[in-house]
A protein has these predicted regions:
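Membrane-interface anchor segments at the N-terminal boundary of transmembrane helices
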Residues: 9-22, 237-308, 312-313
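Multi-pass, polyprenyl lipid-linked donor-dependent membrane glycosyltransferases
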Residues: 14-17, 51-83, 114-124, 325, ...
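Transmembrane-helix motifs of polytopic, lipid-linked glycan transferases
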Residues: 16-40, 78, 82
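Transmembrane-helix signature of polytopic, membrane-embedded enzymes
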Residues: 29-55, 73-74, 96-98
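Membrane-interfacial entry segments at the cytosolic side of transmembrane helices
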Residues: 42-44, 96-104, 138-155
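Specific aromatic-rich, kink-prone transmembrane helix
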Residues: 71-91, 107-111, 128-129, 341
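Membrane-interface alpha helices of multi-pass inner-membrane proteins
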Residues: 102-118, 130, 155-160
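Membrane-proximal stem/loop segments at transmembrane-domain junctions that anchor or position
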Residues: 165-255
């Protein structure tokens, strides 16, 4: 159900802050990418396409809505810009200094703030930590990089705090209740599986207690034990996951400017899951070039690209199965990550 957007005077300062942060975030990311591409034409493309990506309705509409999406997108753009700098600094083996300390502090601050805008972001941080450990094993020369050691250590702390916070807050309870009501309890075989894991009758007094203590773990075991269901449920809905590129909750007056922005939005935010396939092909091509040319800059791009694909995929899968309502909204950050990757790596 859509509602016409209207200005709420008591929230204007919050919306103003969200818009200012968004402008800064996407501008910073554009400059960071432009600084890491070689040709003048490519730099020009970066400072045009990336801000346009962030200022078209798929992203910009959320800046005028009170929700976690605006901060999630903006802090993600800032975090990505800083991680890009960290990756290239590590790849070039630059020595530590005052600039490195500042970069480390800014990166950790941005990642910390971004992590706690949405629970699913925690998994991207966990994957980033794993990638850091793998990098220490593969590239011995970065093991003495104090900045990377500090970042990796803090990433582990953020992951632990984030997971603990998500579980203790019980924010998962309502979404998982929706999942059980729609995907588990109406099907006798699935309900029987849960009973085998100790689930009492849903009408029993013990059920709320069991659900509170065991539901996430039991549901995860169900998905792992039924890979066919898990795979087909996810892949059959990919089209729907990628189908939205404008927030569906509020509508705006269809002025000429709005229609032009929507047309540009459809180009920059294609609503097809083929974007995922194109991203994979781009990263594979870069990986081949990095391997054959032994180029440290290409290696940094590949590292960042693989982390983005892994993180976006994990977040999309988790958010897809974590609720039965508002799936496109829950998976939006992952979808927009794939769309952004297309332009960044094409440049």
């Amino acid at each position: 159900l859509e509602t016409e957007r209207a200005v709420q005077p008591c929230f204007t300062r919050i919306v103003l802050f969200q818009n200012l942060l968004s402008v800064i975030a996407w501008s910073v990311l554009a400059l960071a990418v432009a600084n890491r591409v070689a040709g003048g034409f490519e730099k020009l493309l970066a400072v045009i396409i990336i801000p346009a990506f962030g200022f078209t309705p798929a992203i910009a509409d959320w800046d005028s809505i009170l929700g976690s999406e605006s901060l999630t997108f903006s802090l993600f753009a800032i975090s990505l810009a800083l991680l890009l700098k960290v990756c290239f600094k590590a790849a070039s083996d630059e020595s530590d200094g005052s600039n490195s300390i500042l970069l480390t502090g800014l990166t950790l601050t941005a990642l910390f703030l971004w992590t706690f805008t949405r629970d699913s972001n925690i998994y991207a941080i966990a994957i980033l930590f794993v990638f850091a450990l793998i990098s220490f094993a593969i590239f011995p020369r970065i093991r003495k990089n104090k900045g990377l050691i500090i970042i990796s250590t803090v990433l582990l702390v953020i992951t632990i705090l984030g997971l603990q916070s998500a579980m203790e807050s019980r924010r998962w309870k309502k979404p998982l209740t929706n999942v059980f009501a729609e995907y588990i309890l109406p099907f006798p075989a699935r309900e029987e599986f849960m009973v085998g894991l100790g689930m009492p009758d849903t009408k029993a007094a013990e059920y709320p207690v069991w659900f509170k203590e065991n539901a996430p773990r039991a549901y995860a075991r169900f998905l792992i034990a039924h890979p066919g269901y898990t795979f087909t449920s996810f892949t059959s809905n990919l089209g729907g996951i990628f189908s939205e590129n404008i927030q569906p909750y509020f509508y705006s007056e269809q002025t000429t400017v709005r229609k032009t922005l929507v047309a540009l939005n459809d180009i920059l935010h294609p609503n097809t899951y083929l974007v995922f396939v194109l991203d994979l092909l781009l990263i594979l091509g870069l990986a081949f070039s990095a391997f054959t040319r032994k180029n440290s800059d290409l290696t940094a791009w590949v590292w960042l690209g693989v982390w983005l694909i892994a993180s976006a995929t994990i977040m999309m899968v988790i958010n897809f199965f974590a609720d039965s309502i508002g799936v496109t909204r829950h998976t939006m950050l992952a979808v927009e990550t794939f769309r952004l990757m297309l332009w960044v790596f094409l440049i």
